[in-house]
Every structure is written in structure tokens, then in C-alpha cells.
Amino acid sequence: MRWSGRAHVFGDDVDTDQIIPGRCLRRVSYDELGRYAMTGADPEFPEKVREGDVIVAGKNFGCGSSREQAVMALQQAGVACVVARSFARIFYRNAINRGLPTVEAEEDPTEVVEDGNRVTVDLDELVLRAGSEEVPLREPPEFALQAWREGGLLELVKKNPDKPPWRD
């Protein structure tokens, strides 16, 4: 699996209220969430992001309240993948469930990648590339890879109802 796009770089402890502010949840339908993605951290993000772009972040991305809409907002904004030093577990599981690739880096990718860099996330080689710079990536669990390939856990289970991935 591989994704290439422009990097949007954020620091440590990006919480779900920065990913999709709570005030937006009462005013918009699910289909409109992408218009407000990351506006708690960067109000201009929805205008800057393009289909296939990659979010690069520090530690504890997606912390805060359990908010499935945070993942949905990123997907609807066109984000192809999120690479971070670490993820809050609830966000990470929501991302697997919804089919948004979330890949942990072995070292802080924000020390190498700059906002606007063209990056490639290569899971075959377990590396994030930004020009001549590389950041090693942790190998995601097999069930996460399967869910990402199918577009989420629900789609994976629909295609394999007699063999859910958690039984392996």
C-alpha cells in the first residue's frame, strides 16, 4: 500500500476538537464534515487540503473525546493517510473501523517533514519519504491493513462474514 500527496504538518496532542470542532457537529450533516476538518488547529485547512494529501503529526494524534466524526471529517476533506509518532487509541481504532490509514512512525516525522512537502507513505518498505529524507514506519497490524484495503472494518466483515479478522 502506498499514498503520495502534500504534507500538512501538525504537532503533538492534536485532539478531536481540533480535528472537528464540537460546535460544527450540531450544525452540519455528516456529508459536510470535511468543510470543517482540522479547523480547530488551522482554520484554512479545508481550503488548502487536496484529495490524496497526508497529515503528518507528532505524538498522541486524535486525543480527547471519542468522536468518530473526526475520522469522517478527515476522509471527507480528502486526506488519504495520517502518519504520526503515536495515536490516541480510540482515534486509531475509529480510523481502522472507518478505513482511514493511520500509520505510526518510529521517530517524530515532524522533525523531517515540512508543511507542503510532497511525501510518499510506503507500507511495503515501511517508510515515509519527503525528498531525500526518510522516516521509518511501524508495521501496522494485519487486520488494520485488511480493513484499509476494503474501506473499513464493516466492509471487510461484509466481504468475509464467516472469517472476521479478529479471529486470526
From Swiss-Prot:
GO MF, one annotated term: 3-isopropylmalate dehydratase activity
Pfam families according to UniProt: Aconitase_C (PF00694)
Keywords for this protein: Amino-acid biosynthesis, Branched-chain amino acid biosynthesis, Leucine biosynthesis, Lyase
EC number(s) from the headed UniProt entry: 4.2.1.33
UniProt pathway: Amino-acid biosynthesis; L-leucine biosynthesis; L-leucine from 3-methyl-2-oxobutanoate: step 2/4
GO biological process: L-leucine biosynthetic process
Entry-linked PANTHER family: 3-ISOPROPYLMALATE DEHYDRATASE SMALL SUBUNIT 1, 3-ISOPROPYLMALATE DEHYDRATASE SMALL SUBUNIT 2-RELATED-RELATED
Family label: Belongs to the LeuD family. LeuD type 2 subfamily.
Name assigned to this protein: 3-isopropylmalate dehydratase small subunit 2
Organism in which the protein naturally occurs: Methanopyrus kandleri (strain AV19 / DSM 6324 / JCM 9639 / NBRC 100938)
